[in-house]
């Protein structure tokens, strides 16, 4: 497979799925703006995909858009993370003309300070970069209960060894950066599936 390297001027859209993230979204957007302004030559946009949060997340993002013009809001009914990510990917590619898509959780469990490292790997020729909880330097959130931790470890092990992709340590993590071509391939294969992506 041919590798595609980042070219200056490419558009990078960071997708932030939200549900009741009013307490976190402003801090996250502030951090992302601060961090990405130091990555020269690329146009960053931030797409908040809100699932009708009853806590006012959507209203807060609307006011934030006045402060930063590259913040976009895509609202929809609550249909789960998978559907929100698919809506976000489609909007990022079709409307915002993304060349590169990044996705991260809006609850601050994914460190925005790591995003430049992901971008550097894409720039070096990687097609897909995944942030892993299961490698040195990674961690599982403190607020996860024992059952969730066990389910995550077992689920990832089944996928890693069942599919033979042992070099990827965290298949269920949501911190990713990838080339647009992966969305296009996924979009063709997914059809009407609306589960986790």
Indicate residue ranges for each PLM-predicted region.
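Conserved catalytic loops of nucleotide-sugar-dependent glycosyltransferases that act on lipid-linked
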Residues: 81-89, 109, 113, 141-197
């Amino acid at each position: 497979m041919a590798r595609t390297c980042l070219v200056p001027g490419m558009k990078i859209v960071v997708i932030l799925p939200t549900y009741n993230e009013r307490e976190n979204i402003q801090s996250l957007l502030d951090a992302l703006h601060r961090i990405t302004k130091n990555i020269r030559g690329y146009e960053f946009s931030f797409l908040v995909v809100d699932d009708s949060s009853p806590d006012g997340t959507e209203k807060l993002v609307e006011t934030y858009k006045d402060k930063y013009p590259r913040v976009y809001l895509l609202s929809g009914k609550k249909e789960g993370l998978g559907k929100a990510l698919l809506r976000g990917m489609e909007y990022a590619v079709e409307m915002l003309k993304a060349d590169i898509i990044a996705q991260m959780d809006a609850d601050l469990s994914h460190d925005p300070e790591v995003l430049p490292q992901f971008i550097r790997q894409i720039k070096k020729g990687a097609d897909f970069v995944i942030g892993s909880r299961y490698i040195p330097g990674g961690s599982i959130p403190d607020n996860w209960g024992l059952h969730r931790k066990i389910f995550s470890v077992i689920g990832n092990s089944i996928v890693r060894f069942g599919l033979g992709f042992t070099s990827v340590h965290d298949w269920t993590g949501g911190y990713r950066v990838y080339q647009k071509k992966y969305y296009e391939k996924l979009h063709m294969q997914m059809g009407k599936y609306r589960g986790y992506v």
